[in-house]
């Protein structure tokens, strides 16, 4: 039996679509889809545009160890210390992850999801220091959020269409091997990992997945390697991304959006109905 977390409280609203939440430098940073902005939100709910993003859907954030911000999308860009934006790699993609050795991983799939294209298997690519990209994993069933375990040894990716978290060993050169299932039967999107190695991910027992109007609109659980679920929290909108942060790292931020299908994205964006919630966790 999992433990239910405290009811989440509203941190910020009035946003278009919120994704790729990351705690950085004392604030929650996120990709503000539909606005082309990277936004930072403090614990009082104050919002600030801190960097340029993308005018498209499907992009995210990560940082190199020296503090420079990476932004994915049609290409991978880097924000320099004095605010200028430069190309880091011509390789575009969706989600990003950077390990302690500064291996930069980007994922994506070669079909037009927003345009209703037929699904194709996705990939993970490693971006070398000179910006070149090489495949390190394939046959990913709609790649989404990625995290690196606290010891830097393992990359875990959300395969959204499969309802699965898959794990890979990270080699000294950034190569991935030893693919295995971390947990399945889920509804993963943007995920995060705590210092004890528990991954916080979306579930598949929500209204959108089940068609049950009595099911919660959104739910996030903490799942251990092997599939054991230890904690749960529910939201009144679908949760697209979650992030751990706060002064002691024990705030769980829940980035929630309306979703009525890709053909209704513009209508959803125009309503500015996205919300960010926060609750407390024991880790």
Residue spans for each PLM region:
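A short loop-to-beta-strand structural motif that recurs across blades of beta-propeller domains
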Residues: 37-39, 75-77, 122-125, 164-166, ...
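Short, solvent-exposed loop/turn segments at conserved positions within beta-propeller repeat blades
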Residues: 33-34, 111-121, 160-163, 208-217, ...
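Beta-rich, blade/repeat-based domains predominating
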Residues: 12-25, 53-73, 90-112, 118-123, ...
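A short helix->beta-strand "capping" segment at the edge of beta-propeller domains
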Residues: 1-14, 43-45, 279-282
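Short loop/turn segments immediately following beta-strands, especially the blade-tip
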Residues: 168-174, 280-283
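Blade-level signature of beta-propeller repeat domains, shared across WD40, Kelch, NHL, RCC1
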Residues: 241-283
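Beta-strand initiation motifs
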Residues: 1-7, 45-49, 82-86, 127-134, ...
């Amino acid at each position: 039996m999992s433990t239910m977390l405290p009811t989440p409280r509203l941190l910020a609203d009035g946003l278009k679509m919120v994704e790729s939440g990351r705690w950085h430098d004392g604030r929650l940073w996120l990709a503000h889809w539909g606005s082309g902005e990277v936004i930072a939100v403090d614990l009082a709910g104050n919002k600030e545009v801190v960097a340029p993003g993308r005018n498209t859907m499907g992009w995210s954030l990560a940082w190199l160890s020296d503090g420079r911000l990476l932004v994915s999308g049609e290409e991978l860009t880097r924000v320099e210390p004095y605010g200028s934006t430069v190309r880091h790699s011509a390789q575009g993609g969706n989600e990003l992850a950077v390990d302690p050795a500064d291996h930069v991983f980007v994922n994506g799939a070669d079909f037009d999801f927003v345009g209703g294209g037929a699904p194709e298997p996705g990939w993970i690519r490693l971006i070398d220091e000179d910006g070149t990209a090489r495949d390190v994993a394939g046959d990913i069933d709609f790649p989404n959020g990625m995290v690196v375990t606290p010891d830097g040894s393992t990359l875990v990716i959300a395969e959204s269409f499969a309802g699965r978290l898959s794990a890979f060993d990270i080699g000294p050169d950034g190569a991935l091997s030893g693919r295995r299932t971390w947990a399945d039967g889920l509804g993963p999107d943007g995920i995060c990992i705590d210092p004890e190695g528990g991954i916080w991910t979306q579930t598949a027992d929500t209204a959108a997945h089940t068609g049950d109007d009595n099911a919660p609109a959104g739910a996030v659980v903490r799942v251990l390697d092997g599939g054991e679920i230890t904690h749960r929290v529910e939201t009144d909108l679908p949760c697209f991304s979650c992030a751990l942060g706060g002064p002691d790292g024990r705030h769980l931020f829940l980035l929630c959006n309306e979703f009525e299908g890709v053909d209704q994205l513009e209508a959803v964006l125009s309503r500015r109905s996205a919300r960010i919630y926060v609750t407390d966790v024991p880790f």
